[in-house]
UniProtKB/Swiss-Prot annotation:
Binding positions for Mn(2+) per the UniProt entry: 14, 196, 198
CDD domains: DRE_TIM_HOA (cd07943)
UniProt-recorded name of the protein: 4-hydroxy-2-oxovalerate aldolase 1
Entry similarity comment: Belongs to the 4-hydroxy-2-oxovalerate aldolase family.
InterPro entries cross-referenced by the UniProt entry: 2-IPM_HCS-like (IPR050073), 4OH_2_O-val_aldolase (IPR017629), Aldolase_TIM (IPR013785), DmpG_comm (IPR012425), DRE_TIM_HOA (IPR035685), PYR_CT (IPR000891)
PANTHER family assigned to the protein according to its UniProt record, in alphabetical order: 2-ISOPROPYLMALATE SYNTHASE 1, CHLOROPLASTIC-RELATED (PTHR10277:SF9), HOMOCITRATE SYNTHASE-RELATED (PTHR10277)
Binding site for substrate: 13-14, 167, 196, 287
Domain Pyruvate carboxyltransferase: 5-257
GO BP annotations, alphabetical order: catabolic process; L-leucine biosynthetic process
Top-level EC class as recorded in UniProt: lyase
Family annotation (Gene3D superfamilies): 1.10.8.60, Aldolase class I
Catalytic activity: (S)-4-hydroxy-2-oxopentanoate = acetaldehyde + pyruvate
Length: 338
């Protein structure tokens, strides 16, 4: 049976941001097992910034990507193992290693205006026989027509699904509808569309529902919303809403609720929620993974994290520029750079 939605869990990849990329092997195994039993279609696992994302800038992981991937591949019986690669961070060699470790799905992520740098990775993924997905991050920064043109490039390179990715949790339902509509009108009928929402404006579930209503099939979500910023669309909440809409999804709602409350929430050293800092991410349109970096810079330079994030939004900063938050703090406080 073809279901109304394909549920792509991101607890073990985007959720890495919420634990500073410090999931243990035992935690990954337990969460993956619970997700598999609950019925999700795929489980994405990697450093929060994708394959090879462990750096001085992003933060190092407690384990390697391959160790995490192998753990999930061993734990699951039916769900597909997915991973993320960002060209310029992860290489084709990293992708090949991930495939050997057990990943069969890969999302190739670029900034929403830079799809052209995904060609090599998408081509390689297809050659490896992987389910290959284009992932257009910070989609709110492109107009619907411009985003659709970038999606068409990814489709041309070989992607069989392309995502609208609200990395900043900055979009409202109208924004999502316009972008999904534009992709659906531009891409081949056989090319699927996905939605990756963040909850910074408390619209993660609403935006995901809107995307499906406008033609998206794949939906990213995470247990207890575990993810950068205020988190992703909470998986258990989305599934409950899907039930109310009579959508077929293949998941056990109670099992998802139990996994969220018993396995994931206890791991949060900072609550994944909408608060003054995470709300500012969405309001200012800033990449959600900036949260921890902004809080660290704010503490060091005695400045409100919201002020840093609002200025980052004004400057149009994107993923990978987290270190520039220190520059902003120095500019705003007049501190000595020496």
């Amino acid at each position: 049976m073809i279901r109304d939605v394909y549920l792509s869990d991101v607890t073990l990849r985007d959720g890495m941001h919420a634990v500073r990329h410090q999931y243990s092997i035992e935690q990954v195994a337990m969460i993956a097992t619970a997700l598999d039993r609950a019925g999700v279609d795929s489980i994405e696992v990697a450093h929060g910034d994708g394959l090879a994302g462990g750096t001085c800038n992003y933060g190092f992981g407690a384990h390697t990507d391959l160790e995490w991937i192998e753990t999930v591949a061993t734990a699951v019986k039916r769900a597909r193992v997915a991973t993320l690669v960002l060209p310029g961070v992860g290489t084709v060699r990293d992708l090949r290693d991930a495939r050997r470790a057990g990943a069969t799905v890969v999302r190739v992520g670029t900034h929403c205006t830079e799809a052209d740098i995904s060609a090599e990775h998408i081509t390689a993924a297809r050659e490896l026989g992987m389910d290959t997905v284009g992932f257009l991050m910070m989609s709110h920064m492109s107009s619907p027509s411009a985003l659709a043109a970038q999606a068409k490039l990814m489709e041309g390179y070989g992607a069989t699904c392309v995502y609208v990715v609200d990395s900043g949790g900055a979009m409202v339902m109208r924004d999502v509808a316009e972008r999904v509509d534009a992709l659906r009108q531009t891409l081949l009928p056989a090319t699927e569309i996905g939605i990756h929402a963040h909850h910074n404006l408390s619209l993660g579930v609403a935006n995901s529902i809107t995307a499906v209503q406008h033609g998206a099939h794949r939906v990213d979500a995470s247990l207890a919303g575990m993810g950068a910023g205020a988190g992703n669309a909470p998986l258990e909440v989305f599934v409950a809403a899907a039930e109310r809409l009579d959508w077929t999804h293949g998941c056990d709602l109670h099992a998802l609720q139990d996994a969220a409350d018993d396995l994931v929430r206890p791991l949060q050293d900072r609550p994944v929620r909408v608060d003054r800092e995470t709300l500012t991410l969405g309001y200012a349109g800033v990449y959600s993974s900036f949260l921890r970096h902004a809080e660290a810079a704010a503490a060091r330079y005695h400045i409100d994290a919201r002020t840093l994030l609002e200025e980052a939004g004004r400057r149009g900063m994107v993923g990978g520029q987290e270190d520039m938050l220190v520059d902003i703090a120095l500019d705003l406080t007049g501190a000595d750079r020496s």
